[in-house]
Amino acid sequence: MGSLCSRNKHYSQADDEENTQTAEIERRIEQETKADKHIQKLLLLGAGDSGKSTIFKQIKLLFQTGFDEAELKNYIPVIHANVYQTIKILHDGSKELAQNELEASKYLLSAENKEIGEKLSEIGGRLDYPRLTKDLVQDIEALWKDPAIQETLLRGNELQVPDCAHYFMENLERFSDIHYIPTKEDVLFARIRTTGVVEIQFSPVGENKKSGEVYRLFDVGGQRNERRKWIHLFEGVTAVIFCAAISEYDQTLFEDERKNRMMETKELFEWVLKQPCFEKTSFMLFLNKFDIFEQKVLKVPLNTCEWFKDYQSVSTGKQEIEHAYEFVKKKFEESYFQCTAPDRVDRVFKIYRTTALDQKLVKKTFKLVDETLRRRNLFEAGLL
């Protein structure tokens, strides 16, 4: 009898402990659910090479702890790969231009650089790249300085030459140092294609401050074959941040060289706007790469792009840059309102001029985004 009572007491204690654990788990789930309700979900979208991932890295630097030494070191093979890929594009481009252009001679490499070019092109085509050494840097510098490569660089918009080509070539010696650790700037310039989905949680004014919203930002692959992975992220989004590289109006897609990048961006922007799940979602349009745009637009006519064929130049210098920018901005505004029902006054739409590599500008822009979204939340709560 005593043993039965003892056993019942044991079972009772076990049940109590299990009930306590269950209650604790339920309490935690409830807390996490409540906490999640206060986290604003932001979706970072845009075509490939729009600068989305650079914006994402800036957020990590600005509003989180940045990159620790281990993370920085992980970028060494990425940066070395970028160097090899860049010099390969330029070398192969010069060969192609030398075969097909009327002024073929200016794209012909000097005799001493032909062999170097073939060697570097072979390295750039590998799946695994060697670490940069002083000898390889010497070869890359010799090829980079060849007049044929510099002429080819002027045709970079036709050849998928990355925007950061100059930066890589100016820092070769530092990249090849045996003790090299990438700087924050190196990481921002490093190019690695986003595949799948990456996320980060942050607050533009610090998570512990009552006045600040907490955001969860999702960056997704921009190439066409990556876009199907966006679908499951569409529900419950507070805002879409859409990046458009306005400097790429004369360039073609990496994955389809028949397609103009700006036309692809326009079509993607309009497709996203028409998605039913974004009916009430705020849109923040980042007209990105303005630093490149302001240099290019004075040399390459904006009406090179089919979408901008009605553009007419009115001035020179700064006035022309501003006129061209306002024209592009208006085109995106027209697209937005054409794709948005007239009664959708509850959907916020803002346009920001951005340069993803400019940390101060990115910080200022996200403060403005934060302010806009907080005002919208207060309005929806009836407090404004």
From Swiss-Prot:
Cofactor: Mg(2+)
Region feature (G5 motif): 354-359
InterPro entries attached to this UniProt entry: Gprotein_alpha_su, GproteinA_insert, P-loop_NTPase, Plant_Gprotein_alpha
Residue numbers binding GTP: 49-54, 163, 188, 194, 222, 288-289, 291, 356
Region named Disordered: 1-22
BP terms from Gene Ontology: adenylate cyclase-modulating G protein-coupled receptor signaling pathway
UniProt-annotated stretches for the region G3 motif: 215-224
Its biological purpose: Guanine nucleotide-binding proteins (G proteins) are involved as modulators or transducers in various transmembrane signaling systems.
Similarity-based family: Belongs to the G-alpha family.
Protein name: Guanine nucleotide-binding protein alpha-1 subunit
Organism: Solanum tuberosum (Potato)
